[in-house]
Design a protein with these regions (language model features):
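Flexible "arm" and connector segments at domain edges
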Residues: 1-63, 67-104
Length: 104
C-alpha cells in the first residue's frame, strides 16, 4: 500500500480521539454517518464534473478530495485502505462479468 495512504489512515484513526472543535475530520466523525456520506457524495459529484471538464489538474484535485472523504467513511466503519486493496486484489484477473456473477 502507498505510504501516503497508510499515513493518512493512521491520522484518520487518531482524529477519532480529537475534539470536533479542533479538527475538521473529528467534526465529521462527531456529526456521524449521514454527514460523512453527504461529503462523499459531494466530492463524487465534483469529481464527475471535473472529469467532464477534462482539466487533468482539477480531476486529480477532486479525486484526492473523494479519496480522502472515502477514507473517512472507511475509518468511521473501522475499515481502512487495506480492506479495499484486498477486495481489489480478489477481483484482479476476474472479468467484469465473472465478478458481477460472483455477487449473486
Amino acid at each position: 500500500m502507498s505510504d501516503v495512504l497508510k499515513m493518512l489512515a493512521e491520522v484518520l484513526e487518531q482524529r477519532k480521539q480529537d475534539s470536533p472543535e479542533s479538527s475538521y475530520t473529528a467534526s465529521l466523525y462527531a456529526k456521524g454517518t449521514d454527514t460523512i456520506l453527504k461529503k462523499v457524495g459531494e466530492e463524487a459529484a465534483e469529481t464527475i464534473i471535473a472529469g467532464k471538464g477534462g482539466d487533468k489538474e482539477q480531476i486529480v484535485y477532486e479525486t484526492a478530495d473523494l479519496w480522502f472523504h472515502s477514507m473517512v467513511l472507511l475509518a468511521h466503519n473501522d475499515l481502512g485502505p487495506d480492506d479495499v486493496l484486498k477486495e481489489l486484489g480478489r477481483r484482479f484477473g476476474l472479468s467484469g462479468l465473472e465478478e458481477k456473477a460472483s455477487r449473486k
